[in-house]
A protein has these predicted regions:
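Alpha-helical membrane-embedded segments
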Residues: 127-156, 166-174
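Soluble C-terminal extramembrane regulatory/interaction domains of multi-pass membrane proteins
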Residues: 152-526
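Hydrophobic alpha-helical transmembrane segments and immediately flanking/interface helices
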Residues: 89, 121-142, 200-224
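Cytosolic juxtamembrane amphipathic/interface segments immediately preceding
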Residues: 1-6, 46-50
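Catalytic and GAP-homology cores of small GTPase regulators
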Residues: 8-13, 123, 149-156
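Long, low-complexity, intrinsically disordered segments
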Residues: 537-588
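Transmembrane alpha-helix detector for multi-pass membrane proteins
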Residues: 20-35, 45-119, 140-151
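Alpha-helical transmembrane segments and their helix-start/interface "positive-inside/aromatic belt" motifs
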Residues: 2-19
Length: 588
């Protein structure tokens, strides 16, 4: 914005200098011939004056046509892309009215002088008429380039957003100035309508993946909210009770609740965010989702600082609706971003509005189990970490609702199969128990330890190993939280090791021995597999088979005594199988 302003100022300075030089040249040329203006023009002088006026009339007509074509094409097309409000803004702009009105008036004056000079042939006024027409034409010529740049800059999306924002603030000021209830309703309706125009510009930008304009729109909504909160304490009660049901498009019950809580403007802004979030999730613009979540948190903090319980309650309702959108669209990334900002909101109002923090913790628990029922149980892990962080902040600040927050956190698993041993749930309980034990909150740490004894020992050993192995404080990918959730600060590591010894019976030396034995077992298995693949096929260990003999002759067969059998036939003996030790080993 600063660079753009500097560029505009530089262009204006250069253009003003050029106009001043041109004016000086005109004065320099006219001064020696100033006495000719009072003398009548005859013959060629009259024709020259008439030709000059005709040329000026032709040029002004072309210039006016060009400006009308520019405005008639550019303004509606841009309004179709962003918002119809642009046409109203363009018509209401004073500079647009001044420039277009000047071109129309200059055309009329020049055309009138051209016609009158041709009809009357006035010799005395010919030169002054021509001079006036030339002056009007020169001013029009010099204003074309600056006005063209002004129109193009008028159509920039950031400019549109800024103008609509000023319209909203002006409507809020009118709401405070008016005393008539009917006029107050009209001012409130204008403010809500302009807020919806801001939301429409942001929505179109998100659909077109225009993140810059979307960020400008969200920033404008936040600034409008801040301006309204600054003026709200000075508004009359009748203005705060004004109704705007048709503009918001809400049901009668919710509209009555909004009027009772005096949160019409707040709900109008939150309703626009509620329309923007599903679109941002669908087009996969994660930055916009994060900005919407952060903006909602900022709105909630501002109303909580003012003690506006009604508006703060509406913020929590819309936060819950956002979480529902993330679950319906099955967007884990959006759910993570929203839960993170929701937890930060509850953490920031722990001291000023502890009841609100407790409600937020309940809602986080509720939507975590909704995720489990919808087939996304892994989302419960991140909720467990956030509830643990909220409990840690509550015990650190010693707020009176800290025990209820801890009870909500402990009851998060509900002893349900598949949730009791969720890795994130177990890790969050271990880390929080270690931190509370280190800070001297033994009763809360004991409750968590008794809860952890329900977890199978194998799961506990693996979980403790993962926590102790997390040495890096920050996560190795781009994430909103930035911090590694499993990382434990060095001040709490001793408490983690002590807790592991109590729960699993394994101390540091035992863990090292177990790790060494596990590594040795794996190496032995690997060596066995490798040896089996490379070893030659062993020779069977049975008795050496007899050498093959020549078959007996006919005479030898006749002389051979008959075997002792009932039929006198010789039984053919079947070869016996080799002993098991002589069988080759099966290939692994």
């Amino acid at each position: 914005m600063k660079t753009r302003t500097a560029t505009s100022a530089g262009f204006a300075a250069i253009w003003t200098l050029l106009c001043a030089v041109l004016l000086a040249l005109l004065i320099f040329d006219l001064l020696p011939h100033f006495e000719l203006l009072t003398q009548p023009a005859r013959g060629d002088a009259l024709r020259e004056a008439s030709n000059a006026i005709t040329a000026c009339s032709r040029f002004l007509g072309v210039a006016l046509s060009m400006l009308v074509a520019l405005c008639a094409l550019a303004i509606p097309l841009t309004a179709n892309v962003y918002t119809p409000k642009l046409i109203e803004l363009f018509v209401a702009d004073r500079l647009n009215r001044l420039v277009i009105g000047y071109f129309v008036l200059a055309n009329a004056v020049v055309l009138w002088n051209d016609v009158m000079l041709g009809l009357s042939g006035a010799e005395v006024a010919a030169r002054p008429r021509a001079l006036v027409c030339v002056a009007l034409t020169l001013v029009a010529l010099l204003s074309i380039a600056p006005y063209l740049l002004y129109v193009l800059r008028f159509l920039v999306p950031q400019s549109i957003v800024g103008r609509i924002q000023r319209e909203v603030v002006a409507s809020i000021d009118d709401l405070g100035d008016e005393t008539d209830p009917a006029e107050q309703d009209q001012a409130l309706r204008r403010a809500v309508t302009n807020i919806q125009y801001l939301g429409k510009v942001t929505l179109r930008s998100i659909q077109r993946h225009d993140r810059d304009v979307a960020a400008e729109g969200l920033q404008a909504l936040e600034e409008v909210f801040q301006a309204y909160q600054t003026r709200k304490p000075y508004l009359s009660p009748s203005a705060l009770r004004s109704s705007c049901r048709d503009a918001l498009g809400l049901g009668p019950e919710l509209s009555l609740e909004i009027e009772r809580k005096q949160a019409v403007i707040e709900v109008a802004i939150l309703a626009e965010l509620n329309l923007l979030l599903p679109v941002a999730i669908r087009v996969e613009v994660g930055e916009v989702v994060a900005q919407i979540a952060a903006l909602t948190r900022h709105l909630g903090l501002r109303v909580a600082e003012r003690g506006d319980a009604g508006a703060a309650d509406m913020v929590t309702l819309y936060f819950n609706t956002f979480l529902r959108h993330a679950l319906k669209t099955r967007s884990p990334d959006s759910f993570y971003k929203l839960v993170y900002q929701y937890r930060r909101f509850a953490e920031n109002v722990l001291e000023s509005a502890p009841q609100l923090s407790e409600r937020v913790a309940f809602f986080l628990d509720y939507y975590a189990h909704q995720a489990v029922r919808m087939g996304m149980p892994y989302l419960l892990n991140v909720v467990a970490y956030d509830l643990a962080a909220l409990c840690e902040a509550a015990y650190e600040r010693k707020v009176h609702c800290r025990k209820r927050l801890l009870d909500l956190f402990i009851a998060l698993d509900r002893d349900e199969p598949g949730i009791l041993d969720m890795p994130g749930m177990v890790k969050a309980q271990i880390i929080l128990s270690a931190k509370l034990a280190t800070t001297g909150v033994e009763d809360a740490a004991g409750l968590l330890e008794s809860e952890l004894r329900k977890v199978p020992e194998e799961v506990l050993r693996e979980t403790f190993g993962q926590i102790i192995a997390a040495r890096e404080e920050n996560f190795w990918e781009i994430a909103d939280r930035r911090r590694h959730l499993d990382h434990v600060e060095p001040a709490y590591r001793k408490a983690v090791r002590d807790l592991r010894k109590r729960l699993t019976g394994v101390d540091e030396a035992g863990v090292a021995t177990m790790l060494f034995m596990e590594e040795a077992r794996k190496e032995a298995q690997l060596a066995a597999r490798k040896g089996t693949r490379e070893a030659p096929r062993p020779t069977p260990r049975g008795p050496k088979p007899a050498a093959p003999q020549e078959p007996p002759s006919e005479a030898e067969r006749e002389e051979a005594p008959a075997e002792s059998s009932g039929s006198g036939r010789r039984e053919r003996s079947e070869p016996s199988p080799p002993p098991p030790s002589s069988l080759p080993p099966r290939r692994a």
